[in-house]
C-alpha cells in the first residue's frame, strides 16, 4: 500500500463526505429550489437523487434540463440564494424543509477525527501545503470551512469559478490547486476523497495518488492519534486505502 510520507509534496482534500457532512444542506437546497419554482419535484426528489449529483460541476448540474426543465438559469440563481441561508442555519428555511419533507434538517457536521488528522499532517511537515479542492462556489466553500473551524489547516482553498473547464472534476482543477508549488512529480501529490469511483478517477485523471477516507476511518484515526510516536510516516495510514482504478 502506498503511504502518505514526509516525501509527499502536497496533500489535497475533498470536502463534502470526506471531512464534513453537508449533503443534507445540499439536498434541502434542491428541495427548496424546486418548491420556489413551483416544481413538483420538491415532493419527490430523494436524497439518492442528490447524492447522484456528487462529483459533477456546477455548470453540468445547472445545464441539466432533465432536472430543471428549461429554467436552468432560474434554478441556479435560486439554489445559490437558498444554500447560503441554510449555511447560516436560517430557521425559516429549516422549518419549511421540515414542513415539505417531514424530516428535521441537520446543519453542517465535522466528522470525528477530521481536525486531529489535519493537525497531524500539519505538524508532520509544516512547510508542505495542504489544499482543499471542492466543487462548491469558492466563496461558499471558504465560509463553510471557516464555520467548521478548520480553515487554519489549509494553505489554499479552491472552489468553483466562472471558468467551467478549470473546475472540479476537470483535471485542470489540480493545476489551480498546486500552482506555484513547483510540483515535478504529480504522483507525489496525495488526493484524499470519500468516493472510490469518482474521487479516485479524478485523482488518476491528473496523475495524483488517490486515497479513500471515510467517516469510519476518520474515527479509527481519532482513536489512534494519542498513541502516535513517529513523524516519519503516518502510522495510521492503514486506515486509508488506495483502490485500483480501471482505466
Identify the role of each PLM range:
Residues 109, 131, 136-190, 197-201, ...:
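Substrate-recognition "cap/lid" segment bordering the active-site pocket of phosphatases
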Residues 4-112, 123:
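N-terminal helical cap/lid subdomain that shapes the substrate entry/recognition surface
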Residues 190-224:
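Acidic, Mg2+-coordinating phosphoryl-transfer loop and its flanking beta/alpha structural elements
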Residues 4-6, 124-128, 181-187:
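Glycine-rich phosphate-binding loop signature in dinucleotide/nucleotide-binding domains
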Residues 39, 126-128, 208:
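Short glycine/serine/threonine/alanine-rich loop segments
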Residues 25, 70, 112-113, 136-137, ...:
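Short beta->alpha linker loops
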Residues 33, 117-128:
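A short, Lys/Arg-enriched amphipathic alpha-helix followed by its capping loop at the start of a domain
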Residues 149-160, 222-244:
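Structural recognition of alpha->loop->beta junctions
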